Swiss-Prot record:
Keywords: Aminoacyl-tRNA synthetase, ATP-binding, Cytoplasm, Ligase, Magnesium, Metal-binding, Nucleotide-binding, Protein biosynthesis. This is Phenylalanine--tRNA ligase alpha subunit. It comes from Fusobacterium nucleatum subsp. nucleatum (strain ATCC 25586 / DSM 15643 / BCRC 10681 / CIP 101130 / JCM 8532 / KCTC 2640 / LMG 13131 / VPI 4355). Its EC number is 6.1.1.20. InterPro entries: aa-tRNA-synth_II, aa-tRNA-synth_II/BPL/LPL, Phe-tRNA-synth_IIc_asu, Phe-tRNA_ligase_II_N, Phe_tRNA_ligase_alpha1_bac, Phenylalanyl-tRNA_Synthase, tRNA-bd_arm. Its cofactor is Mg(2+). GO terms for molecular function: ATP binding; magnesium ion binding; phenylalanine-tRNA ligase activity; tRNA binding. Binds 2 magnesium ions per tetramer. Tetramer of two alpha and two beta subunits. It is found in: Cytoplasm. GO terms for biological process: phenylalanyl-tRNA aminoacylation. Mg(2+) binds at E252. Coiled coil: none annotated. PROSITE patterns: AA_TRNA_LIGASE_II.
Length: 338
């Protein structure tokens, strides 16, 4: 029986050495070392041996099995390493190939313009204030001296949530809230989203406004002109400006501020409708009724206010003709501002 065991040993050693895959190696292990394998059958034959032979043959079988298990482990390790190397070689990355191109985002042109405007006014000592976009009719209209019959209160110009709540049509309500909570003197701007039911080449239902307010003693129209002229020059460069008389319910006197056309430089073109000027914002001295509403005495303090559309400034800065392009998420359009 000893010869039979040694023959099996040589046979399995050859098979292990010639095995090329882990699957084949596992088949060899099961055939020889498994519960129904050849060594199990050899162990069963020991019952036919004499009492003297059994310990010797049992020792030989155990030594051979130990040797075979060691060979199986070594071959298993070698085959695993071989498979890993083959896989790594097949998956090797050619670092000379061009990399994947990623599309990186950038600041939206409206946000970029808003930050520019905020920085300009911040350097002039203005506080930057935020407020709710869902507003009361009282703060959106009544407190601003807007008559009950004013067309801006109509459903065609305002989004009503109910009879007393609206989506704010301007950021002016933030000024009312600020004056009710802060003493004078102060300078503040309130940039943010506003809403009106319009949609065409120069209007969208949601857009951005920045309104400003300065209140203190002996504030003059000259102060207004100086601050707004500086703002325009910071945004558009050294251009001429002019102020035209206008009407707003919350300022008296009121004016529209124009800037020299950046296309024709005042000679007249399609953009400025041959006038040489482009309207940039509304402004004026705060109406005494507005000051009274927030508990201020117009005989002791006064001030000026202004409001400018951020989309309009952005369009003029970049020569964009359709306001709706800002909100259509067209990457071909937005990539221009990287």
């Amino acid at each position: 029986m000893k010869e039979e065991i040694l023959k099996v040993k040589e046979e399995i050693q050859t098979y292990i050495k010639e095995s090329k895959t882990l699957q084949r190696l596992e088949e060899i292990r099961v055939n020889y070392m498994g519960k129904k394998g050849i060594f199990t059958e050899l162990s069963k034959k020991m019952k036919d041996l004499s009492v003297e032979e059994r310990p010797k043959i049992g020792q030989i079988i155990n030594e051979v099995k130990e040797k075979i298990n060691s060979l199986l482990d070594e071959r298993n390790k070698a085959l695993k390493e071989k498979e890993l190397n083959e896989r790594l070689e097949s998956e090797i990355i050619d670092i000379s190939l061009p990399g994947t191109k990623y599309n990186y985002g950038t600041i939206h042109p409206i946000n970029e313009t808003m930050e520019l405007m905020k920085n300009i006014f911040s350097k002039m000592g203005f506080d930057i204030v935020d407020g709710p976009e869902i507003e009361t009719v009282e703060y959106n209209f009544d407190a601003l001296n807007i008559p009950k019959t004013h067309p801006s209160r109509d459903l065609t110009d305002t989004f009503y949530l109910n009879d007393s709540i609206v989506l704010r049509t301007q950021t002016s309500p933030v000024q009312i809230r600020y004056m009710l909570e802060h003493g004078t003197p102060f300078r503040m701007i309130c940039p943010g989203k506003v809403y009106r039911p319009d949609y065409d080449i120069s209007h969208t239902p949601m857009f951005h406004q920045m309104e400003g307010l300065v209140v203190g003693k002996d504030i003059s129209f000259a102060d207004l002109k100086g601050i707004l002229t500086h703002f325009v020059k910071e945004v558009f460069g050294d251009r001429k400006v002019r102020f035209r008389p206008h009407f707003f319910p919350f300022t008296e006197p009121s004016a529209e501020m124009d800037v020299e056309c950046m296309i024709c430089h005042g000679d007249g073109c399609r953009l400025c409708k041959e006038s040489g000027w482009i309207e940039i914002m509304g402004c004026g001295m705060v109406d005494p009724e507005v000051l009274k509403y927030v508990g201020l005495n117009p005989d002791e303090v006064n001030g000026f206010a202004f409001g400018v559309g951020i989309e309009r400034v952005t369009m003029l800065r970049h020569g964009i003709g359709d306001l709706r392009a800002f909100f259509e998420n067209d990457m071909r359009f937005l990539k221009q501002f990287k």
